[in-house]
Amino acid sequence: MNYLVNYCKISFYFLMSISLSLFLISLKFLLTDLVYFIEWEILSLQSMSIVMTFLFDWMSLMFMSFVLLISSLVIFYSNQYMEEDYNINRFILLVLMFVMSMMMLIISPNLISILLGWDGLGLVSYCLVIYFQNVKSYNAGMLTALSNRIGDVALLLAIAWMLNYGSWNYIFYLDMMKNNIEMMIIGGLVMLAAMTKSAQIPFSSWLPAAMAAPTPVSALVHSSTLVTAGVYLLIRFNDVLMNWWMAQFLLLVSGLTMFMAGLGA
């Protein structure tokens, strides 16, 4: 059991140290207005190439810092909360996979790589919700997975629509999206995807169901990953939504969700 406890503590210290480092770096990026855009050519075959892009600015670094901070605290809490669990190794690895999927989503300015992180969140979320392997967990996991599939379909439609413009790097088209009705459709689809991840009405039913997972998982799912993924996407597409009636619609839906959550509490 000492080995398992050390395994949790190693993950805690590792994530906490990276979180503090990223927070300090994000402050430097914010004050000096630095942005790093990195392209990594994974495969090149004659005229075809597969390029992975990463965007490092103060916003992405600060979000990664907060995600790692909350995740490290959840793992530290799991050290004692799940001390008697025989599968705690598997549990910690699933949580770390969750964090990696979220970081993949945050640093990607490309809708394809965002979809990889997005589906990674959905898959690991399903594995965590059904962790206890009983009928209640299976039903909750299926509800969580199916609710988030709607957002996946919306993101796939946005990817298909961006084929018209020759690139999936949405970061280059944000100014164009403000004045182009067709590009606003992409913003609307991304907003629909964010609503499913953030459990807004009418997709909020999966959030109480996710409590079938172990308590640390529920805290992680609710606070630092799934909900934050939707919020982060909306922040990136903020310029598009602010010039459209969808912003008022989103405000209404979020207000209704808060009201319903208050009644439920």
Curated annotation (Swiss-Prot):
GO molecular function list: NADH dehydrogenase (ubiquinone) activity
What Enzyme Commission number(s) apply to this enzyme?
A: 7.1.1.2
Reactions mediated catalytically: a ubiquinone + NADH + 5 H(+)(in) = a ubiquinol + NAD(+) + 4 H(+)(out)
What parts of the sequence cross the membrane?
10-30, 50-70, 92-112, 113-133, 153-173, 183-203, 215-235, 244-264
EC class name: translocase
ATP-binding as UniProt keyword: no
Q: Which GO terms describe its cellular component?
A: mitochondrial inner membrane
- For whether the record's keyword set contains Cell division, the answer is no
Q: Which UniProt keywords apply?
A: Electron transport, Membrane, Mitochondrion, Mitochondrion inner membrane, NAD, Respiratory chain, Translocase, Transmembrane, Transmembrane helix, Transport, Ubiquinone
Q: How does it sit in the membrane?
A: Multi-pass membrane protein
InterPro entries membership: ND/Mrp_TM, NU5C-like, Proton_antipo_N
Q: Subcellular location, in the record's words?
A: Mitochondrion inner membrane
Q: What does this protein do?
A: Core subunit of the mitochondrial membrane respiratory chain NADH dehydrogenase (Complex I) that is believed to belong to the minimal assembly required for catalysis. Complex I functions in the transfer of electrons from NADH to the respiratory chain. The immediate electron acceptor for the enzyme is believed to be ubiquinone.
Q: Which family does it belong to?
A: Belongs to the complex I subunit 5 family.
Q: What is this protein called?
A: NADH-ubiquinone oxidoreductase chain 5
Task: Give the organism, scientific name.
Answer: Anopheles quadriannulatus
